[in-house]
Swiss-Prot record:
Protein name: Phagocyte signaling-impaired protein
UniProt keywords, alphabetically: Antimicrobial, Immunity, Innate immunity, Lysosome, TPR repeat
Matching InterPro entries: NAA25_NatB_aux_su, TPR-like_helical_dom_sf
Primary location recorded for the protein, binned into one broad class: other
Annotated signal peptide: none
Family, per entry: Belongs to the MDM20/NAA25 family.
GO cellular component annotations of the record: lysosome; NatB complex
């Protein structure tokens, strides 16, 4: 009966998701305690109680129960499972190994416990211990899976263990893993294709490519792994420089599948390499003429047009240009071949992307002429429209290539406006003629016209430095998305435009429409999350941060993928899963959002100080520890999500992406430094030990050094010349705002205040803090005043938006720290001023005066001075925020939109989003300031 009751309690405690209400845990705890009253020695019940305590934030009580259970060395599976959950939540994975080691010693020969012990070692990447346990299991039950657990563990020691960087030890371990498998091969005990794949992997890591090739063609691989991908053999032949064999293989594969673009690339590569080494092996195509003849033969023999061989012909021409073959050897101008390709496949949506692959090898001076030829091929002029969907697609392709060749960059503002008008009308015609009756998931065939038009309008706005073209672009996008509700390219441009204008709530709606989930939260979250920080909408930011962190926290259970791989013998996937787990756990985006979420929580603290400190404790911040692996940060951003047709060099784009990652890395350093510095202040004034003082002092010094280092690199914001580009990093906003000075002087004041020795330094520190507070709110008022007097409010909104929100964040963090200081000194007894005395003989000899500490009352008064400055400015700030004018759309703009047939519907939708975002931001900021006022009023 008791076991049944415990099972019921277990089900009640088990979290269905991370957002389970706190009250459920209280009820579960009550149920557990009822059972324990009847039988207080039940280990499972005490484990459940410890877990409930943990979820309720009562960590110390939970730790005491778990420690008592550890000493009893439990062996019952449910108890061990609950203890495992507790250790996972407190990030004590090594303790899981300890309890299962103790349990397996109590019950030697227990397969389940040994298997769980193996998995426990797997969680902490203790590959040596994995090997030991796997061999114990194999001796207990001689099965191939257990043996290959051991083989895999040896391989992982070589690749990812402590000795992985020692070339000699790593080689020895890989040799051991190979010999272990060789033994089974000799005994004819290999049973599965996954075991064969693991052996190939071991050989590959040793770079024994010839052995791999021999084994791949041998009887074991042929029988157990008949479906081995051709790519394995192709890669081996390339690494072994067996170009003739590769050439023969690729000819055979292309004969069977003549539309494989990747096969053509390897086939042409083999021909070029054979030419270089003058290899004329029979039955190979060892000249460009033979290669061209083979490709031409496939083109002539195919019953229908396939892109593969035509792309191959372009690839051959490209490589001949790259390797500087004589013009006599080349098969015509590359531009002529590209033009032929356009004539053949211009009606395909992929044609423009195909042509982009080769345009880099066309001389820049010839590109505009080539683009003009494409336009002529379309036979569309200002008074004609496409006659069919295919005709329209050819026109779209020619326009995209024209932009890529730089044709639009040279246009004047008037020509850009005319081109925008033409593209918008083409979109309307295409939608009305060819875009009816499509499925909701389909993108309209004329949608690319609208996307190009939006880019054109951004170009125009950039030239004019005005917002009206951007509003027109937003209206067109709104119209596009009402027709093609799932056009994610349009949604991405919408998101970009709203963020560039500092309209966070409108950008959030665009982000939500993308329906980003799962791994996309890491790869695409950068599009929005980073700009939510200090975005003026803390509730929205919390929602997105929680959603993102929920994915990453749950993905710590990706260890289950590894467990499944071991259980099902999918050994070849283990390295892939381990790499994937490392990329997620070291994701720059995840780490930055983790830090930002904690800072946001502090900024939004409201209620009583006791409630705030309780919430702070739940964050489990340890300022003395830097838990970020800075050298292992991973850039998981998907930077290919945008389709761009801007005339940028790919090499420059790659350099910009690397620089962007470096800037985000430095932003993370500054934000993490801020979080740890503020936390060190809280620890100092709540615990008040010498260790806490030393930590705060070290972090204060680190804060100053960080800014010196980052400023010395002189990073430049990402270029905003084109719409489809990375948004400028928030690093520049942090450097421009007074973060450095405010928290440097705050640290100096608080450290001196805690010591209480240098009275003048303490008073001057308090005065500097008061001045910083006044300056912050003057900066808010000044930026809003400048904005209100600017001619184009919407164009200048982003700057004032960043300034206001940064200043509010700084003020909120300072306020939280000062309320903690106030609490410390207001509750302290009022002793007489303490005096550090020295021995009389020492005083007589050195004539040094005694050090008189500042009284608690005087310290409290200085803290109150800072809080009063905050209070005064917070009260005044409400009126300042109310004066922040709403950007209004001009009547001429409405008329222009009407002429474009976009109608009032799109214009009113954009106007409403603009108004809601602006007024909503002011409302959210006022609410935040009111919460801060309430917090101050409860203190002073």
């Amino acid at each position: 009966m008791q076991q049944l009751q415990l099972h019921d309690v277990w089900e009640k405690l088990r979290p269905r998701d991370e957002s389970i209400e706190l009250g459920h845990y209280k009820k579960a705890l009550q149920d557990v305690e009822k059972v324990l009253k009847k039988n207080p020695t039940i280990q499972c019940g005490r484990a459940l109680k410890a877990w409930a305590f943990l979820r309720l934030g009562r960590d110390e009580e939970s730790a005491a129960l778990i420690k008592a259970l550890e000493q009893e060395t439990p062996t019952e599976s449910t108890t061990l499972h609950v203890m495992t959950l507790c250790y996972k939540e407190t990030d004590q994975l090594d303790k899981i190994c300890q309890i299962f080691t103790s349990a397996s010693k109590q019950l030697p020969g227990n397969e389940e416990l040994l298997s769980q012990l193996f998995i426990a070692h797997m969680r902490v990447n203790d590959f040596k211990a994995q090997q030991t346990v796997a061999m114990q299991l194999y001796k207990l039950k001689p099965r191939n899976p257990f043996y290959f657990w051991a083989v895999t563990s040896v391989m992982l020691q070589a690749l990812r263990g402590p000795d992985a960087k020692d070339q000699q030890k790593s080689s020895l371990l890989l040799s051991l893993a190979q010999r272990m498998v060789d033994k089974l091969i000799a005994d004819n005990k290999i049973e599965a294709s996954q075991e064969v794949q693991l052996y190939l992997q071991i050989l590959q890591h040793q770079e024994k490519y010839q052995e791999m090739l021999t084994f791949l063609d041998g009887p074991v691989c042929t029988n157990l792994y008949p479906g081995a991908p051709h790519s394995i053999k192709i890669d081996l032949l390339k690494k072994l420089n067996k170009w003739a064999d590769l050439n023969k293989l690729m000819k055979q594969l292309l004969t069977e599948d003549p539309d494989r673009w990747d096969y053509y690339q390897d086939y042409i590569l083999s021909t070029i390499e054979m030419i270089k080494c003058k290899d004329e092996t029979p039955e190979t195509d060892h000249t460009v003429d033979m290669c061209h003849e083979f490709i031409a033969g496939i083109i002539e023999s195919q019953p229908r047009k396939n892109r593969g061989p035509y792309l191959a012909r372009l690839e051959l021409a490209r490589l001949m240009v790259k390797h500087k073959f004589d013009k006599e050897q080349q098969f015509g101008e590359l531009t002529e071949l590209l033009l032929d390709y356009f004539r053949m496949f211009g009606d395909k949506t992929c044609c423009a992307n195909d042509l982009k692959l080769f345009l880099e090898y066309v001389e820049p001076a010839k590109r505009p002429g080539f683009a003009a030829q494409l336009m002529q091929e379309c036979r569309i002029n200002p008074v004609t429209l496409p006659s069919s969907k295919e005709h329209m697609q050819r026109h779209i392709c020619s326009l995209q290539i024209a932009r890529f060749c730089g044709a639009h960059a040279a246009l004047s503002e008037e020509h850009l406006s005319a081109l925008y008008t033409a593209l918008s009308l083409h979109y309307e015609h295409g939608y009305n003629t060819f875009g009816q009756g499509l499925l909701p998931t389909d993108m309209g065939p004329s949608d690319p016209y609208a996307l190009l038009a939006v880019n054109i309008m951004y170009d125009r706005a950039w030239k004019l430095q005005r917002s009206e073209p951007l509003v027109e672009a937003l209206c067109l996008l709104n119209h596009l998305l009402s027709n093609s509700i799932n056009n994610f390219h349009g949604k991405l441009l919408n998101l970009q435009l709203y963020h560039r204008l500092g309209l966070v709530e409108a950008a959030h709606r665009a982000y939500e429409s993308l329906d980003i989930k799962h791994i996309q939260l890491d790869s695409l979250g950068y599009l929005h999350c980073s700009h939510l920080c200090n975005g003026g909408f803390p509730a929205l930011a919390k929602q997105i941060f929680d959603q993102t962190l929920h994915f990453f926290i749950n993905d710590t259970n990706s260890v289950e993928f590894l467990k499944t791989s071991y259980n099902f013998g999918s050994f070849s996937k283990l390295i892939e899963f381990l790499d994937f787990r490392d990329r997620l756990s070291n994701s720059l985006h995840f780490t930055l959002i983790s830090v930002e979420a904690l800072l946001l929580e502090m900024v939004c603290f409201s209620g009583t100080l006791a409630q705030n400190l309780a919430a702070y404790r739940l964050m489990r911040i340890k300022p003395q520890e830097d838990r970020i692996k800075w050298d292992e940060m991973s850039d998981n951003r998907d930077l290919t999500i945008f389709v761009h047709w801007d005339p940028t060099v790919e090499q420059l784009r790659e350099e910009c992406q690397k620089d962007s990652f470096s800037q985000e890395h430095e932003l993370l350093q500054l934000r993490s430094g801020l979080l740890r510095l503020v936390s060190s202040f809280i620890e100092l004034f709540t615990k008040g030990g010498d260790d806490e003082y030393q930590t705060a002092q070290d972090l204060s010094r680190h804060w100053e050094e960080l800014f010196v280092t980052v400023r010395a690199k002189n990073r430049q914001p990402a270029c905003e010349r084109f719409l489809v580009n990375l948004l400028p990093s928030r690093l520049h906003s942090v450097l421009a705002m007074p973060y450095e000075a405010v928290f440097r002087d705050l640290a100096s004041f608080l450290l001196a205040l805690w010591k209480g020795e240098k009275h003048d330094q303490i008073r001057s520190g308090a005065e500097r803090c008061v001045k910083h507070v006044n300056d912050l709110f003057e900066l808010i008022a000044g930026s809003i005043k400048t904005y209100n007097s600017s001619g184009d409010l919407l164009w200048n909104r982003k700057k004032v938006h960043d300034t206001v929100n940064a200043c509010v964040e700084i003020a909120a963090l300072v306020l939280f720290v000062m309320t903690v200081c106030f609490d410390k000194y207001s509750q302290a007894p009022a002793p007489q001023p303490t005096r550090k005395t020295k021995k009389k003989d020492s005083e007589q000899n050195n004539h040094e005066p005694a050090v008189v500490l500042m009284t608690e009352k005087n310290r409290l008064q200085l803290v109150v001075d800072v809080l009063r400055a905050l209070k005064t400015n917070l009260v005044d700030c409400e009126a300042v925020l109310s004066s922040w004018e709403l950007p209004l759309l001009s009547d001429s703009l409405a008329g222009a939109l009407e002429q474009m047939s976009l109608g009032a519907k799109s214009e009113s939708a954009v106007r409403l989003k603009l108004m809601d975002t602006h007024l909503g931001e002011i409302k959210e900021l006022k609410k935040l300031l009111k919460d801060k006022l309430k917090l101050i009023n409860k203190s002073i």
